[in-house]
């Protein structure tokens, strides 16, 4: 699999299980790009929804994607600390055009004190039935959710102290 080069700008595209484009983030800067891990950053980035509406992100963010895990993690740097938004999703693929993944609706919001909240369980159930998620996918997603929660509790990976700050410092060297 090809991987994006550090310093390059790529778009990030999330899809739904049925193949429909869900959301696109334009111009994220790649800070690390390997076959297994991609770390990107963006600030005041244009986001385009599937219905054509668009908005601009409000704060700098560090985005973590892994080819093995069924989740991605966005660390948002705000005045009162780092907030994380975690998407339960397929592992990423990079096709030379964009970083792509399937969004499976379940999300976890993590607060600066590392407490967290599971979001969108109702949306997950609705889409699971509507798009007929296979039972094996449902099982994988719930197993991966448990791994993600373990990472949060253990301060592992992007949740480790200084991870987001250190990558943000790297991002500033590209500006």
Curated annotation (Swiss-Prot):
GO terms for molecular function: magnesium ion binding; nucleoside diphosphate phosphatase activity; ribonucleoside triphosphate phosphatase activity. SUPFAM superfamilies: FomD-like. Its cofactor is Mg(2+). This is Nucleoside triphosphate/diphosphate phosphatase. Mg(2+) 2 binds at residues 105, 107, 120, 123. Mg(2+) 1 binds at residues 87, 103, 107. InterPro entries: DUF402, FomD-like_sf, Ntdp-like, SA1684. It catalyses: a ribonucleoside 5'-triphosphate + H2O = a ribonucleoside 5'-diphosphate + phosphate + H(+); a ribonucleoside 5'-diphosphate + H2O = a ribonucleoside 5'-phosphate + phosphate + H(+). Disulfide bonds: none annotated. Keywords: Hydrolase, Magnesium, Metal-binding. The active site is at 23 (proton donor). Belongs to the Ntdp family. Has nucleoside phosphatase activity towards nucleoside triphosphates and nucleoside diphosphates. Its EC number is 3.6.1.15, 3.6.1.6.
């Amino acid at each position: 699999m090809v991987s994006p080069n550090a310093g390059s700008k790529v778009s990030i595209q999330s899809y739904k299980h049925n193949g429909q484009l869900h959301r696109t983030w334009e111009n994220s800067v790649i800070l690390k790009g390997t076959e297994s891990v991609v770390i990107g950053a963006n600030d005041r980035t244009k986001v385009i929804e599937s219905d054509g509406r668009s908005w601009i992100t409000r704060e700098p963010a560090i985005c973590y994607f892994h080819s093995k895990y069924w989740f991605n993690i966005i660390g948002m740097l705000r005045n009162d600390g780092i907030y994380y938004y975690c998407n339960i999703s397929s592992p990423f693929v990079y096709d030379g055009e964009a970083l792509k993944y399937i969004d499976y609706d379940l999300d976890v919001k993590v607060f600066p004190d590392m407490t967290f909240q599971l979001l969108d369980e109702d949306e997950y159930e609705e889409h699971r039935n509507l798009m007929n998620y296979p039972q094996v996918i449902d099982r994988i997603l719930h197993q991966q959710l448990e791994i993600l929660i373990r990472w949060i509790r253990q301060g592992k990976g992007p949740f480790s102290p200084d991870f987001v700050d250190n990558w943000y410092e790297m991002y500033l060297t590209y500006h």
